[in-house]
Amino acid sequence: MLSVPHLDRDFDYLVPAEHSDDAQPGVRVRVRFHGRLVDGFVLERRSDSDHHGKLGWLDRVVSPEPVLTTEIRRLVDAVAARYAGTRQDVLRLAVPARHARVEREITTAPGRPVVAPVDPSGWAAYGRGRQFLAALADSRAARAVWQALPGELWADRFAEAAAQTVRAGRTVLAIVPDQRDLDTLWQAATALVDEHSVVALSAGLGPEARYRRWLAALRGSARLVIGTRSAVFAPLSELGLVMVWADADDSLAEPRAPYPHAREVAMLRAHQARCAALIGGYARTAEAHALVRSGWAHDVVAPRPEVRARSPRVVALDDSGYDDARDPAARTARLPSYRWRRGSALQSGAPVLVQVPRRGYIPSLACGRCRAIARCRSCTGPLSLQGAGSPGAVCRWCGRVDPTLRCVRCGSDVVRAVVVGARRTAEELGRAFPGTAVITSAGDTLVPQLDAGPALVVATPGAEPRAPGGYGAALLLDSWALLGRQDLRAAEDALWRWMTAAALVRPRGAGGVVTVVAESSIPTVQSLIRWDPVGHAEAELAARTEVGLPPSVHIAALDGPAGTVTALLEAARLPDPDRLQADLLGPVDLPPGVRRPAGIPADAPVIRMLLRVCREQGLELAASLRRGIGVLSARQTRQTRSLVRVQIDPLHIG
């Protein structure tokens, strides 16, 4: 495969007689292209060619293992077309690097896996839950968006759906955001399905282990693959079910070109394989809800009485909730301690969860006078303080130290904390609650499970440990840091983070209380209080549809120097009212937190241009951009190549 976009096409080669038996569709080969040897895959064998010139000869077969199956090739083509990418970029995500020793290992012949009986009672609490399991048992292509109840052991429900599908003779693919979720689902799945038939794929595996497990899926010995985002391309045949947990987690968005989202790839795969699909989570994204609204998927949601019985009591604590007479400093205090200290959670021996948006000490700084965010002078990354005795602010992107902070907007040298991190919060709690154990779970220091007993747990979103019997209470801090972001998904992301934490708290009948430090009138806070993720997703989808934002439309973001972006638009002939009804929006600045495209000098200004089309014209927009990228690629040399970064429906639009 060739890395330059204008050569992203098939090439014909002659096959020498000595390689004819091994050079079958799907195998890796080496061919000579413009005088150099390059890697490739055999796509098909034909007796003739449409090429009228002289054909070159295949140099050698790297391995007779057919790693690029017909199903995965179709998926690669579809993803490249959907995201305006090259097949080479998608193949880099889909097919891992070869490990010769692993290929030579003898694989046991796949047999029928041992599957324990599935108890459907866990799904009975949900409308259409039993019907969904029954459809999987009959190998029907049932598609559902599942709203997990608070306190639900989601991995058990996923494992039951997987076991039901494997028992029916089909394979299953389950995608989760991170290693911790993978471990949780692995433990639940192997309790029902023979461990030798279950494979886990994640980025943390070494090349040898990853390729061994990937081959187990290819050769048919694995019937259930659990993995993080890139595992969505696992080469399973007879696919019966594709599952995605917590599709709101941005870990499922691939940071490498062409930047596909695992949820979208999974749904593409379910459509191509005509198999069942399941998206689950405590909260719901507008994209998942759009699948329900379109009729492509069904709702699997518990009735309201069951939701109320299983959810904790949620209290919003705004400024009017502070008692100035009792605590004059409470109105400006970050930890409204007396309000939740008065609860009985710690006294009863239950742990209390404190969720903060960011890890570290003070991960974000701003000017004390004009409130402009403090950014690195080198790469424009956010500046942070690493500890109480830090010699200066440190860039979270490039690591440069700025010992003399001065605002680039107003010149002030006074700074303030925008967000207080988990480490600083733990310090504050330690002083406020002497004698109580304070546990921090954030960043590289993750605590998967708590021991029984009272404790204060400070955790960042997604790092919350599970507690035996659930937490007695939870405090959700710095809500403005989530809701106040200038981002399309700010409200959706905040609700997902809050509900993921609140789902770990005991039901209201057992005394569970969640306190969110936010104005109770905010619609997102109201959705948390009512525990209504479906209603929030419905409102979010309606609002985006009204103003023309994804998922009601497709948007392409073009990032790069102004001249190169303009050249791409001209090469792609966009916008073109006669061919494609596209709205051109911008130029705008890159959204906060979005890195600059690679290869562009640090001092070169970067803009973002947006192209918006209706849902029906998404593939046509991507095709136009692919053609334009190919034209630019053909014009440029290796020394001058500076292509625009193209993202279709990026998470952060600006």
UniProtKB/Swiss-Prot annotation:
- Which co-factor is required? Zn(2+)
What Gene Ontology terms describe where this protein resides (cellular component)?
A: primosome complex
Which residues are listed for Zn(2+) 1 binding in this entry?
Answer: 367, 370, 407, 410
Query: How, per the record, is the cofactor bound?
Result: Binds 2 zinc ions per subunit.
Give GO terms: molecular function aspect only: 3'-5' DNA helicase activity; ATP binding; DNA binding; hydrolase activity; zinc ion binding
What keywords are assigned to this protein? ATP-binding, DNA replication, DNA-binding, Metal-binding, Nucleotide-binding, Primosome, Zinc
Q: Does the keyword ATP-binding apply?
A: yes
* Amino acids binding Zn(2+) 2: 376, 379, 395, 398
One Pfam annotation, family name? PriA_3primeBD
Could you confirm whether the keyword Transmembrane appears in this record?
Answer: no
**What does the record list as GO biological process?**
DNA recombination; DNA replication initiation; DNA replication, synthesis of primer; double-strand break repair
Q: What family does this belong to?
A: Belongs to the helicase family. PriA subfamily.
Tell me, what does this protein do in biology? Answer: Initiates the restart of stalled replication forks, which reloads the replicative helicase on sites other than the origin of replication. Recognizes and binds to abandoned replication forks and remodels them to uncover a helicase loading site. Promotes assembly of the primosome at these replication forks.
* Cited HAMAP family: PriA
Oligomeric state and interaction partners are given as:
Component of the replication restart primosome.
**Protein's name according to its UniProt entry:** Probable replication restart protein PriA
Q: What is the lineage of its organism?
A: Bacteria, Bacillati, Actinomycetota, Actinomycetes, Mycobacteriales
